[in-house]
UniProtKB/Swiss-Prot annotation:
Organism in which the protein naturally occurs: Oryza sativa subsp. indica
Domain of life: Eukaryota
Protein name as annotated: U2 small nuclear ribonucleoprotein B''
RRM domain residues: 10-89, 158-232
Basic and acidic residues bias locations: 108-123
Function: Involved in nuclear pre-mRNA splicing.
Organism classification: Eukaryota, Viridiplantae, Streptophyta, Embryophyta, Tracheophyta
Length: 232
């Protein structure tokens, strides 16, 4: 599908999305899927009758939006083929950046950002003294190395062990990410152990490709995935 006469810009418009997916899960899944193309400023998905099955993803750079436009066309997302084009109008967050929003809208955005910042600060405080270090991956990797230094890593095999996943991660979110690589079979999560998952491929060469591509990938801005081979 072509984007018609709409010139390339920082926002991609996605349609033919599965309308049964809840809004927050849809936004998280789109963030996880699209952030591999570049830094995301905003994901907009509304559940009003006219806007169901649609979403907008705002990138910081036009090149990132262009890569997403090319890479996600006809992508199988929750069982439906995604349709992608460039957005017709400037997104609110981009308008805020260049100062073209009205003062009232700008103030509202600032208030929302302040509330989000406060919420994340409270979460970090509740998580303990190591939360700040873990948010950029260093604390987590150091603790992981400390725990595994006494035992050798598992040899390459067809099953990957995924750690440091955010609590809201779902099997479908991981499937969307890992099914992009050849040989994908399934995702397994353990309800009693949040934050980890197993991803199976047909053989170890295929699992290696996925591991190298997604090592350190952030499903959210604060959780770099740690991927290793599963122990058998």
């Amino acid at each position: 599908m072509l984007s018609g006469d709409i010139p390339p810009n920082q926002t991609v418009y996605l349609r033919n999305l599965n309308e049964k997916v809840k809004k927050e899960e849809l936004k998280r899944s789109l963030y996880a899927l699209c952030s591999q193309y570049g830094r995301i400023l905003d994901v907009v998905a509304l559940k009003t009758p006219k806007l169901r099955g649609q979403a907008w993803v705002v990138f910081s750079e036009i090149t990132a939006a262009t890569n997403a436009f090319r890479g996600l066309q006809e992508f199988d997302f929750y069982g439906k083929r995604m349709r992608v084009q460039y957005a017709k109008t400037k997104s609110d967050c981009l308008a805020t950046e260049d100062g073209s929003t009205a003062p009232k809208e700008k103030r509202k955005k600032q208030e929302e950002k302040a509330a989000e910042k406060k919420r994340r600060a409270e979460e970090a405080q509740q998580s303990g003294p190591n939360a700040a270090a873990q948010s950029n991956g260093t604390g987590y990797q150091a603790s992981r190395l400390g725990k595994t230094s006494q035992e050798p890593p598992a040899p390459p095999n067809n099953i990957l062990f995924i750690q440091n996943l955010p609590a809201e991660t779902t099997s479908m979110m991981l499937q969307i990410l890992f099914q992009q690589y050849p040989g994908f079979r399934e995702v397994r999560m353990i309800e009693a152990k949040p934050g980890i998952a197993f991803v199976e491929y047909e053989d170890d060469s295929q699992s290696m490709v996925a591991m190298q591509a997604l090592q350190g990938f952030k499903i959210t801005p604060y959780n770099p995935m740690a991927i290793s081979y599963a122990k058998k």
